[in-house]
Amino acid sequence: MNKSTKAERSKQLMSTLPGDDVRQVMWRFSDRYDLQMVVQSTREVARGLIANLVANGARNTHDWTPEKNSILTAFDEAGLTQVFMDPADGGFIEGPKNLALALVAYELAWVDGGAATSSLASNLGLSPIHEKGTPEQRSKYMRMAVPPQPGEDRQIKRGAFALTEPLPFVGVDTGVVSGKLRIDSWDDGQDPVFHVEKRGRFI
């Protein structure tokens, strides 16, 4: 099969993929305006900022750059950071969030798998607090991870997790993983806030 035949076949296959109207029925969110808006917001970020970063070679390094940091800001501005949160903590979706989070990852993965993964990283870091924390802990830490509201003078806190497992079972070579951990701040009567840097070869 030559290149033009492959390209034509790919084009035909792409035209057979279901559109938004069909997916909304298939995945049962045709009556969920909140989920439809999440899809639209995610698509705008994916096909705008993230597509430009990929086109400009941002994926060619594992170093954290200001350009990559702009993805998190775009997530905040589009409301994607709040998808995981309960309305009482600054979110906007009632009930289970799995479908909403899957839709976010799906739209981002069409453009860049790394962006899809990064959209879920903060949620993974917050999940233990969300699932096992006291109501006071959930309220405190989940609200810190939501972008500041108008009139609030604070920085958003990001949840994080570290994955270090031996090859060949996952995609991190632990032989070349290194990191630094320090206490960023620890106010009297408060829990410590850690600053973590991790470097490694990711496969």
Set out the residue ranges of the language-model regions.
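Amphipathic, small/basic residue-rich leader segments at the start of a protein or domain
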Residues: M1-L120, K140, M144-D153
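Short, conserved phosphate-binding/catalytic loop or strand-edge motifs used
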Residues: L120-S127
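N-terminal leader/propeptide and maturation segments of large enzyme subunits in energy/redox metabolism
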Residues: E131-P135
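Glycine-rich, Trp-frequent "lid" loop and neighboring beta-strands that shape
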Residues: Q137-I203
